[in-house]
Design a protein with these regions (language model features):
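Generic structural signal for short, flexible, solvent-exposed coil/loop and linker residues
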Residues: 18-20, 37-39, 55
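Short, charged, surface-exposed hinge/linker loops at domain edges
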Residues: 1-30, 60-157
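A short, exposed loop/beta-hairpin motif centered on an aromatic-Gly-Thr core
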Residues: 43-57
């Protein structure tokens, strides 16, 4: 199988100096099988790539790295406002090389040239526009409902 265009999303609670934030991440990634294993390359946000022995492990490692970047941002920023600006900026970062390959892979999936295998065969397909970004909402009085963690994995087609 060639490159695979992935759309992902999740929510995360992030605590910083005097604040708790609900963070929503919506992104695109390119999944590739390389000689040394499976890799997930961040398209939006860009700048993050992780490896695994299979596609699921690579994605989980990628997601964990993104979570660590969010946690690091909370440590480095002294206020919610600066944290929000930082993570929103991260969400706008785009890797143009992987973006071009992602579009090629999406078109290959649409035309049937790319045949999803394994875990990819079961993913629902998204054929519309893909909105990406990171948003943060300050939670002045966090509740148990704020713990809801949504995870979205879609194939871009």
């Amino acid at each position: 199988m060639g490159n695979f265009p992935l759309i992902y999303g999740f929510r995360e609670l992030v605590a910083g100096a005097g604040f708790v934030a609900g963070v929503t991440v919506s992104g695109r990634a390119l999944v590739k099988h390389e000689e040394d294993g499976w890799w997930v390359y961040g398209v939006e946000p860009g700048g993050i790539a992780e490896r695994g022995d299979n596609e699921q492990e690579a994605y989980l490692n990628f997601k964990q790295s993104l979570r660590e970047v969010l946690a690091d941002s909370a440590v480095l920023n002294s206020s919610f406002q600066s944290f929000r600006a930082d993570v929103e900026d991260l969400g706008r970062q785009r890797n143009e090389v992987w973006a071009a390959e992602w579009e090629i892979a999406r078109e290959a999936l649409r035309t049937g040239e790319l045949k999803p295998e394994g875990a990819f065969a079961e993913l629902p397909r998204e054929t519309g526009a893909v909105l990406t970004g990171i948003s943060a909402l300050e939670l002045p009085k966090p509740t148990a409902e704020d713990n809801a963690v949504e995870t979205t994995l879609l194939a871009a087609a």
